[in-house]
Structures are given as structure tokens and as C-alpha cells.
Amino acid sequence: MLSEQAVGLGTGWEPMNTQLDAAELQSERGTREEGSWRTAPRPLEHLHCGLEDEPLSLQEKATSVPWVPAVPQEGNTGDWEMAAALLAAGSQGLVTIKDVSLCFSQEEWRSLDPSQTDFYGEYVMQENCGIVVSLRFPIPKLDMLSQQEGGEDQWAPDPQDVEGRDILKVTYTGDGGEPQGDTPELQVEPPRTLSSVTEDTALWNPGQGPSWESMPRNSTGMLLSPRFLQEDTFSRHLHRTDTDSLLKPHTCPQCGKQFVWGSHLARHQQTHTGERPYSCLKCEKSFGRRHHLIRHQKTHLHDKPSRCSECGKSFRCSSHLASHQRVHADSKSCKGQDFGESPAAQHCVPPVPKCHVCTECGKSFGRRHHLVRHWLTHTGEKPFHCPRCEKSFGRKHHLDRHLLTHQGQSPGSSWDRRTAAF
């Protein structure tokens, strides 16, 4: 692995002078071309962060290397080969790249090609982001971290990659000595997501479950939210029965008709059986539907118990039946008379029966109000009084004729005009 390569120092420095001069010429020419080379060679402090604060042993190792050129621009293969030669030269006074903390800005890191990011990526500490790049996370995800500072959408690591892993972080004790043992002290931190990922957000991975097309959606085609997925009614949205069976679940076994309500099916089955469960208590008639029985019972409220024995007609009042029976009696008397062949005999009209008899004189009348008016002649009562002259009359039309005299009219003339109109 490239991380195990060492930078040669000491005895290999003299042969490198010619290469350093060439590197200076390349840097001046790169400045004019707006490249990524530095204008002047700098010591190793360009590639480490806060070397003054590092332990003395690290400073000694770092100062033993005069300078390391900055990362070449993309596409300058010659510059990259020169930098690789400087790093690989010599075999004495080796200083591994693990002993030096490398720091790149975002612009410098973006200018690297994939081979350069693979080389530096495992050892770069990007302190301005506050995140130590672990060996567990691939370096290309630093592009995601740069988007966070630029105000773009925040990024959360894939939970499948983070699951079951611990983030390794090197901590320095600050006592000025080397870390104990061959391996540095490890601080185990649980995997965390960025602040933009809330607790109730579901991170979906294609390898974890069904495909994207098979995810549950609503009627408009939009994906259902996690909160809706937790509702009890979600099962009803996934398991919907057929529309026809849902609207009309009741089916007649004989004719196959479907009904919405069970009561409608029961009423329909009566047409097959001919059953009439609703019976009238008065006339013992039966009906198949209840509202038919109610309509029939209304006829009993206006019963006509009086029935004519000759023609079968019914009457509500017995007096009406009596008046009707007189018609049959008069017709019989009319048939008993022999009118011959005259036309008058063919139009024989029976006289009106007079059933209302006066108890004083024995006169009979066909109408009751005629009897009442006749009764006034026996009692002498005059119930109709004039409001102006206090005269009284036994009949109302007599009073009306008298009132005309108070209006300055001749009662005879007005009476004649009224009779002439008829």
C-alpha cells in the first residue's frame, strides 16, 4: 500500500539538488499558467497543521525534510512523477507519512485526481470540518463534507455502511512523549448522522428491502410518509377488496342480483317465496311490504260501517244510509204505478221522502232545516233582529229586505231586480 512508502532523507539529498532546481523552474512556469504549484518552495509546514504544537520528536522528523512540493495540477503527469521521485528517493533516515498530519484546503483537494486522493486520503485530517476521516470511510465522501460548508444539502452516511462499525479517532495525550505502544489510543464513538436527518426519518437503501417502484404510495402516486406507514389504517390501504363486492356485498342465491344492504336482499327474497308477512288485524289482508300495510290501515280510519242491503253501498253515517234507502223505496212505488205508454211514464221521478215530521202539526219535511224553520212558526220566535230599528224577523231574507229600507232604497224594486235576475 502507498501508505507504507517512505520519504528518503540524509544521504539521498545531494542527488536531489538538480531535481529541486527543476522543481523551482516548474513552479515559476506554473504560476504564469495559473496552475496549482506554489510560487516558492516552502518547508514541510505547508503539509502539516500546527507543527509547533506537535511533540518534539515529530518536529525533528519533520525538519529533517527540507520541503515537499505542493500537489501538482491535474493532468501534469511530469510534475506528479517528480514529486513521487522525491518521496521515494533514499533509503536512510526514513520518515513515514503517518508521522506527519497532512492538511489540504477544499480547493486543493478538489484539484486532485483520483490517484492522488487515494494516496493522501487515508491520512488527511480536515480540521476545519471538525471530522476525522476514518479508514472506514472512503475519501470521495469529502466532497459531501465540502457541500456542507458551502450551504448545500447536508449529507448523512449510509446506515448500512455505518452499522456495526466504530469510528476510529486518534487522541494525543499532550505529555510530549510518543504514544504508548505501536498503536495509538483509540476513542470509540457511536455512528452519528448530521443534524438534518431527524429521528423519525427513514433512510432507505435499495439493498435493504423492496425496490423503489414497489414502495407504498397514495392515490396520487406520491410515496407515503413514515408517519403514515405507522398508522393502523395503512393495512386497509394496502388490502382493498374489489369495488363491486365492496359496494354490493349481498347477493341473491337464486337470481344472482346484488344488494347493498341485507334488508334489501331479504325483501327481494320474498318475491321468490311469495311470503306476505304483514297482515291487517281488521280485515285480515296481508302485504309483502310494511308501507303497503300502513297505507291500507289508513282506509280503516274512514270506515263506512253502514252498508245498504240492496245495492251493497257503504256509508260513513247511518243518516246517509237512510237517505239512500228512500231512493230504493220510491223507485219501487214508481214501478208499482201504471203510467201506460206515455212519455211521462218513462221519466217517472220518485218523490222526495219526507222523514222529518213536525210533532205539533204532523207535517213532514224532506230536509231538517225545513223542519227547523217550520218549528219557528209554532213557537213565534223571530231570531233575526234589525240593528237599527229593533225589528225582528223569522227568516233571514226577510231581514235583508228590511235593511234596504234604511239605505233609502225601495225594498220592492230591489227585490224585483233580484228575482228578475233569476
UniProtKB/Swiss-Prot annotation:
GO terms for biological process, alphabetical: regulation of DNA-templated transcription
Report the residue ranges that make up the KRAB domain in this protein.
95-167
Which parts of the sequence are C2H2-type zinc fingers?
Answer: 250-272, 278-300, 306-328, 356-378, 384-406
The residues forming a coiled coil are none
As stated in the Swiss-Prot or TrEMBL entry, residues carrying the post-translational modification Phosphoserine are: S410
Q: Any one cellular component term from GO for this entry? A: nucleoplasm
Function, as annotated = Transcriptional activator. Activates transcriptional activities of SRE and AP-1.
Q: What is this protein called?
A: Zinc finger protein 641
Query: Which lineage do the record's taxonomy fields give for this organism?
Result: Eukaryota, Metazoa, Chordata, Craniata, Vertebrata
